């Protein structure tokens, strides 16, 4: 029992129980009916020593409030914690101005000077409302303090409050804006961040204003089948890992047993190169552990049966590599073969280069025609495997390891505005953008474009064009890249009048490209009007535009391609909370119709914002390498089977959107929408993860060395309306993702869930059926496969705290998120 109280200034005073009760009452003001704050105060007092420090008493109140496992407990703990943070930052009760805070950080060399006048700082100060911090959940503030606020990690001094940190991001993003309207844009940007309508990625919070301009944390790249290209891919892996990126790679090297130099050397296959890349990635620390890599391979690869078990703990240790993740790429032809219980033959880029390229094309019919041509060719050596067994084993690997993923590569290349082939995805399989391998590591340092096409026309021999140059083909709306020129087509350079007919294509080279993703997300629950959503979509893309232009590119050629391509990925956050507020289930027709409306609104406003930014700042240099200039919207290529799920209706004029895209010639960005996991944002913004239903109403989340109790927003009043993931079937999940995929030009970090009862097993027929159903509904990806044995009914009603961390016998953390940089966790 406390007798004496030691205040923060060291003064010792007699303990006053009424003040302690008053403190607890203030902590619960506004939601006292949902929490027994008196019990928490009494409990805390009983746990303290006779001489108690103020900080220890506050910590006790916070701990006991959190142990209630309720939303009200989170709010009470957050309110008390906010006072601690403010006193820590301000050094007392008196608040410092933003200018004072920035001066302190600049003197400590943790922040650069921003180009704002004293008058502008004074105006900005009026927009900051520190009282918002006192209405945050505890985990929001803890995540902000521990991960996002600028600090000295040696002395452990924290320099910023939550509102200061958000304003720093907004000020950096708007610093280069037109001076006439800059303050208006800044106010809008800060409002969206502060009111939790817009979620920025971790690199923006950590790096903006520090002079460390690293804003991309995920990248995709391809490795070609030469020693020089392999060396270049190693450099990419190394550089992007120490730049804190999570990686996705398609290594298009030969398979085990393939000939080298006419057969004088036998190729060792992909597995040794996977091991080499693993060593490169893991030798560079990102936070508390090594980097992260997802290797993509074809389901038709001659080594497929060995590649798919690399992560399985039952694989012999000399044949496994559990330190990275793997994604197998399938298409509808392979799945049809699996459904018919037929065999497929295996091939790769070395044995059948044209067939391999067709796998990444837009026409499945063209792939099938070529596949059957090779099958009929007796001179083409073929090894057959059971398509059914291949798919069943792939799905089984997902259940056994949790982190064996699938990508429907034909759907990826069909339902997209990109005209260049998409060869893989990223670490979290939500980014689907074109890549192409480098022929030599020196090309990474080129400050000029490297692609070209040489051809003859009726008028001229040996014409040479940059492969990226826009040309107009007779009969086609808008320009395309010169790399698309074929024999017999009539073309003209953009801006000229005379057409020329191509008589022969002599040589082509695609532009080598590493794809970088710049992310943001919109928290749908907090965008209450169409005007708010439109402005938030604009601010999300405005922020990404800043990142693309101001990022530090460690490899110069990446700057050329990233700024020419201008890829954005804006996702949806807090869908589960939104659905609970609407009292709608993910699995009902009404629920799917609401999800359809949410996805449509998201796509509409982002496309509109891209057009607007294109008008203001110019279209992406490579916009002609997409179909946006031809009026493409997701409605042009989505899988129409999704429309059988519910009587969906449209809320926007999509014909007018297409006309506006044509009139503008596209927009500011080549890619727009991707739905990332959002693991970090769910803590910082008090939102639910991405599109996912809840795993639990309360959960202990770990992040490196930090752990915190997370409770679903408004769980005290909405818990009966939250959909629990474990109570959904995998078909339900496919329906959810299919509805959102309809409106998404890229992909989704699409988790599946399975609760096993006792010795329950999933039949191979069920796995084949549901994998084919994924393809039938237009789903592009399968990310984590979450499974556990539990009482399914209990999960729907009991607030169960679940620890996310699992460590396997190799010492690998299997809990996720894999990417320690949180690049995909906006």
Summary of predicted features, one role per range:
Residues 1-826:
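Extended catalytic cores of very large enzyme megasubunits
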């Amino acid at each position: 029992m406390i007798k004496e109280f030691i205040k923060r200034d060291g003064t010792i005073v007699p303990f006053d129980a009424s003040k302690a009760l008053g403190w607890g009452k203030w902590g619960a003001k506004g939601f006292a009916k949902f929490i027994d704050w008196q019990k928490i105060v009494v409990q805390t007092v009983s746990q303290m020593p006779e001489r108690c420090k103020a900080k220890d008493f506050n910590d006790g109140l916070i701990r006991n409030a959190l142990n209630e496992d309720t939303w009200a407990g989170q709010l009470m703990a957050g309110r008390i914690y906010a006072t601690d943070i403010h006193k820590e930052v301000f050094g007392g009760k008196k608040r410092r101005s933003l200018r004072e805070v920035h001066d302190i950080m600049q003197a400590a060399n943790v922040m650069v000077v921003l180009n704002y006048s004293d008058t502008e700082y004074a105006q900005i100060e009026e927009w900051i409302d520190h009282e918002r911090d006192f209405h945050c959940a505890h985990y929001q503030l803890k995540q902000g303090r521990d991960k996002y606020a600028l600090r000295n990690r040696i002395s452990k001094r924290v320099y910023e409050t939550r509102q200061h940190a958000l304003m720093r991001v907004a000020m950096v993003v708007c610093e280069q804006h037109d001076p006439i309207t800059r303050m208006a844009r800044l106010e809008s940007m800060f409002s969206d961040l502060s009111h939790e309508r817009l979620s920025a990625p971790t690199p923006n919070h950590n790096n903006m204003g520090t002079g460390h301009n690293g804003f991309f944390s995920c990248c995709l790249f391809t490795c070609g089948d030469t020693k020089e290209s392999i060396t270049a891919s190693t450099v990419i892996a190394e550089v992007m890992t120490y730049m804190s990126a999570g990686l996705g790679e398609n290594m298009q090297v030969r398979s085990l047993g393939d000939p080298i130099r006419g057969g004088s050397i036998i190729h060792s296959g992909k597995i040794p190169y996977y091991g080499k890349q693993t060593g490169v990635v893991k030798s560079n620390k990102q936070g508390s552990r090594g980097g992260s890599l997802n290797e993509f391979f074809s389901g038709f690869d001659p080594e497929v049966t060995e590649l798919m078990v690399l992560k399985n703990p039952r694989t012999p240790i000399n044949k496994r590599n559990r330190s990275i993740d793997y994604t197998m790429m399938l298409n509808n032809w392979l799945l049809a073969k699996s459904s018919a219980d037929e065999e497929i033959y295996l091939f790769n880029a070395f044995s059948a280069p044209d067939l391999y390229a067709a796998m990444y094309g837009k026409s499945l019919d063209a792939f099938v025609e070529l596949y059957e041509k090779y099958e009929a060719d007796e001179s083409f050596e073929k090894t057959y495997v059971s398509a059914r067994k291949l798919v069943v084993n792939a799905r089984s690997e997902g259940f056994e390891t949790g982190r064996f993923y699938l990508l429907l590569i034909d759907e990826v290349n069909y339902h997209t505005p990109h005209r260049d082939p998409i060869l893989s995805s990223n670490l979290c399989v939500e980014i689907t953008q074109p890549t192409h391998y480098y022929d030599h590591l020196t090309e990474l340092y080129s400050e000029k474009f490297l692609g070209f096409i040489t051809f003859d026309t009726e008028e001229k021999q040996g014409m040479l064009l940059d492969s990226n140059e826009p040309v107009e083909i007779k009969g086609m709306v808008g320009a395309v890249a010169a790399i698309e020129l074929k024999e017999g087509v009539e073309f003209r350079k953009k801006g000229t009048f005379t057409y020329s007919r191509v008589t022969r294509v002599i040589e082509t080279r695609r532009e080598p490209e590493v794809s970088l993703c710049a992310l943001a997300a919109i928290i749908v629950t907090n965008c209450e009007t169409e005007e708010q959503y439109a402005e938030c979509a604009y601010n999300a893309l405005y922020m990404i535009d800043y990142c693309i232009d101001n990022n530090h590119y460690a490899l110069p050629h990446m700057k050329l391609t990233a700024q020419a391509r201008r890829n954005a990925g804006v996702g949806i956050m807090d869908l589960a909370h939104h659905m609970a507020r609407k009292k709608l289930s993910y699995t009902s027709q009404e629920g799917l119709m609401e999800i359809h409306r949410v996805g449509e609104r998201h796509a509409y406003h982002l496309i509109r914002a891209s057009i607007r930014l294109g008008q203001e700042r110019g279209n992406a240099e490579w916009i002609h390498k997409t179909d946006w200039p031809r009026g493409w919207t997701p409605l042009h290529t989505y899988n129409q089977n999704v429309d059988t799920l519910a009587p969906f209706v449209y809320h926007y004029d999509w014909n007018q959107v297409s006309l506006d895209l044509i009139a503008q010639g596209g927009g500011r960005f080549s890619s727009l929408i991707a739905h990332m996991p959002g693991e970090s944002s769910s803590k910082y913004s008090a939102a639910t993860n991405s599109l996912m239903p809840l795993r639990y109403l309360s959960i202990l989340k770990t992040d490196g060395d930090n752990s915190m109790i997370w409770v679903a927003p408004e769980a005290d009043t909405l818990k009966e309306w939250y959909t629990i993931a474990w109570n959904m079937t995998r078909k339900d999940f496919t329906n959810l993702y299919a509805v959102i995929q309809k409106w998404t030009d890229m992909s989704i970090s699409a988790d599946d869930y399975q609760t096993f009862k006792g010795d329950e097993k999933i039949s191979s027929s069920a796995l084949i059926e549901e994998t084919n159903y994924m393809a039938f509904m237009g789903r592009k990806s399968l990310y984590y496969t979450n499974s556990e044995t539990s009482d399914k009914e209990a999960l729907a009603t009991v607030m169960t705290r679940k620890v996310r961390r699992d460590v396997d016998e190799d010492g690998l953390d299997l809990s996720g998120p894999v990417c320690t940089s949180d690049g995909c966790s906006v």
